[in-house]
C-alpha cells in the first residue's frame, strides 16, 4: 500500500519530483532550494494524510491549517528572496555590460536584455554564476541580503574583468594587422596614409582610455571588496547574536512545554479519578436496587433451588472469574492513583522552585533601589557643580562691572584731557594772531581744528553707542540669568519625575507581594484537593466493603444472572460514556493547543519587545559615545547609567516572566477547578495586564529619555557657562591691558601738556617776539622813507643792507610759522594716536564679545595720514603674529620671479616702541586667541564622533573667511591699479609682482570656493558616520589652506604698505628741502644735520618698524 501511495504521489506531484536540477556553483541557491524542497515535502505529507469519517477529516483540517499557513508563508518568503536576488543580479549584469560596452564598443556587445534569465551572455562573459558568500536564508535581515547582493555583483564584475583581460589581446592583433595593411599600401596615395594614421591614433586613444577605465574598475573593485569584508564581519556578528537569541527562545519553549505536559497529565489523572468515582457510585446504586429486588424474589425462588443447583454451580464459577477480573481492575485503579500522587508531588516541587525565583527577583529589586539611590546622589553632585559654575559666573560679572566703571573713569579723564588740549589750541591761536603775516595759515589751522572737533563729536557718539550696547548686553545677561532659573525649575521637575519612578517601583514590589499571597492561596487549594482525594479514597474503601457484602449475599443463580445482565448494561453505558469523555478530551486537547499557540505568539511578541529594547539601548550607547570628549566624569556617570538601565531591563524582563509563570500556574489551577469559560476569562485578563505592563514600560522609557535629555541640557549649560567664564577672563585681561595703555597715554598727555605750558610761558617771557615786532616796524619806516627819497644816491648801499636784513627777518618769520605749524601738527598727531588707541581697544572689546576676529581689516582710515599709518601698523603687527603662529609651508602663491625681485627690498625688523608695547601685546594675544578658536575648534578630539551641525558650521565659517579674503584681494588690486595709473617709476617691478601674486591668490580662492560648495552638498546629503568623518577631515584641510592664504595676503598687504611709505617719503623729500626749522635757527644748528635727522626719522613709516642697520 505504501509503495502504491508513493507512486500515486509521484504521479500527482510530477511537477515537483521532476524539477531537481539544482545548481552547483551557488551555495546560496542550493540552500534556498533545499529549504523550499523541504517545505514542499512537509506540505505534501500534510495533504496526503486521510481519515475514515468526515468529522475526522474536518478535525485534521483545523489542526493542520496553521502548519500549512506557516509552510506557505516560508515558501513565499523564499520565493520573494529569490526574485529580489534575481532582479538585483540582472541590474548588476546590465551595468557591467554597459561599462564594458562603453570601454570596448567593438568587442563586447550588449546582448543581455530586459527579460533574460541570467544565461544569455556571449563568449566574452563567463555564463556560470559566481561563487557566493556564506549561505543566505530567506528569513534573514534585508541588510544582510544587500551585503550578499553586493558580493554577487563584485564577483560578477571580477569575472567580467577577467574576460576583458582576455579580450585585450585581439586589440593588439588587430592593430598589427592594420599596420601590415599600411605597409602594403605605402606605395599608394598620401591621403589614405593620413586616414589610416588618424584611425590608428584614435584606436590607441581608445585603448588608453579603456586601460584607464580598467584601472578605475580595479580600484573600485578593491574598495568594494574591503566594504564586503566589513559587511561580512558584521553579518557574522549578527548571526552569532541570532544564534544566542534562538538558544534562549528554545530554552524558554522547552520550559513552557514541560509545564504544559505536567498540567495535562494532572488533568488526565483527575479526570480518570472522577470517572472511577462515577462508575463506583453507579455500581453502588445498581447493587442496592438489585439487593432489594433479590430480597423480594428469594421467597419465590426457594422452590426452584433444587432444580437449578447444578446450573448454579456452573454459573457460580463464571461469577467468580468475573469478580477476579473486577478485582484486577481495582488494582489498576490504585496504581493509577499512586502515579497521580507522584505527579502531584512534582507539581509541589515546581511551585517551591517558583517561590525561590520570586525571592531572587525581590533581591534584584532591592539592588536596583540601591543603585537608584546612588544615581540620586550623583545627580545632587551635578547640582553642586552647576551651583559652583553659577557662582563663578556671578564673580566674573562683578569683575566685568568693575572694568566698566574703570572705563567710565578713563572716559572722564579723556574728556578733561580734550578740554585741556582745546585750551592749549586757543592759546596757540592767540599767539599766532600777533603775527600779521601768518593769518592765512591760522585760518587753515582753525579749519583743521573744526574737523578734529567734528571727529571728536563722532567719537563721543560712538562712545554713547557703545555704552548703549553695554546696557543691552547687561539686559541679555539678565535674560540669561532668568533662563538659568527656568532650567533649575526643569531640573526640579526631573527630580519629581524620579520620585514618581520610585513610587512606581514600590507599586511593582507590592504587586509581587500580592502574587506571593496568591501563591499561598493556591497552595491552600492544593491542600484542600488532597483532603478531597483522601475522602474519595475512604469512600472507595467503603464501597469495596459494601461490594463484598453484596457478593456474599448474591450466591443464587437468579441474582447472579441479573447481576451479569446489569453489569453488561453498565459496561455498554460506560463504553458510551468513555467515548463521550474521549471526545471531551479531544476538545480539551484542541483548546490546549490553541492556548499553547497563543502562548507562543505572546513569547514572540515578548522577544520582539526585547529586540526593540536592545536596539534602543544600542542607540543610547551611540549617543553616549558622542559625549565622551566632554569630560571623564560624564563618561563615568553614563557608564553607571548604562549598567543601571541594563539591570533595570533585566529585572523588568524577569518580573514579566515571573508574572507570566504565576498567571499560567493560576490558569492551570483554575483549569482543575473550573471549566473552559473561566480559562478564557483569565486569558482576557492576562491580555489586559500585558497591555497595561506595556503602557507602563513605555511611560518609564519616556521618562528615562526625558531625564537624559535634561541631563544633556545641564551638561550643555555647564559647557556654555565654562565658555562664558573663559570669555570673561579674556575680557578682563584685554580690559586691563587697555586700561594700562589709557593710563600711560593720560600720563604722557599730562606731561606733554605741562611741557607745552612751560614752552608757551618761555615764549611769552622771551623778548624775541618784541624784537621781531620792532624790527618789522623799523623796516616799514625804512620802506616809507625809501619811497620818499627815491632819488638820493648816497644812501644806496645802506638800503641794500637793510633789504638783506629784511629778507632775513622774513625768512625767520616764515621759519617760526612753520615751526608752530609743525608743533600743532605734532599735537594733532598725538591726539589722533590716542583716539586710534581708544578705537582699537573698543573694537577689540566688540570683537571679543561678538566673536568676530577679522573686523580690524575692514576699518576705514581717519582724516589724517598719520592716523591711517598708525592703524595700518596695528594691522601689520597682528599679521606678523599670525605669520609666526601659522605653518612654515605657505600656499605657494608667490612665483620664483616675484621672490627674486622682492629680495632687493631688504628685510624688515620689528621692534615695538615703548608707548605701543602693551597695545601690540594685546593685539597679538587677541589674534592668537581668535585664530586658535577658529582653527582648532572641533579638531582637538579625533576619537569623538562627528556631528552634522558642526561640519556645516565649520564650512560656513570657512566660506565667510573666503569672502573676506576675496574682498581684501580686490581692494589690494584696486590700490595697485591706481598706483599703476599714476605712471610713477618708483617700484614698478614690485607692483607688477604683487599684482601677479594677487591674481594667483584669486585663483586659489575660487578653487577653495568650489571645494567648500562640494563639501557642503555632501555633508547635507550624507548620513554615514565614516563618510562624515572624511568630509570633516577635508574641511579641516581647507581651513588650514585658508589660514595659509590669509598669511600670504597679509604679507602682500605689508609689502604694499612698505612701498607706499617709501613712495611718500620720496615725494616729501622733494618738497621739504627748502624748509627751515625754528629750533635749528634758535639753537644755531646747521640745516644739513637737522635734515639728516629728519630724513632718518621720516624714513621709518611705522612706529614699531625699523630698517636694518647698515653692515
From Swiss-Prot:
Keywords of this entry: Coiled coil
Residues forming coiled coils: 202-287, 314-605, 642-752, 943-1009
Residues of the NAB domain: 13-93
Positions of the UniProt region annotated as Disordered: 850-870
A cellular-component GO term for this protein: plasma membrane
Keyword Coiled coil among UniProt keywords: yes
UniProt keyword annotation of Coiled coil present: yes
Lineage: superkingdom: Eukaryota
One of the record's GO molecular function terms: actin binding
Function: Plant-specific actin binding protein. May be part of a membrane-cytoskeletal adapter complex.
Similarity field: Belongs to the NET family.
Name of the featured protein: Protein NETWORKED 1C
Source lineage: Eukaryota, Viridiplantae, Streptophyta, Embryophyta, Tracheophyta
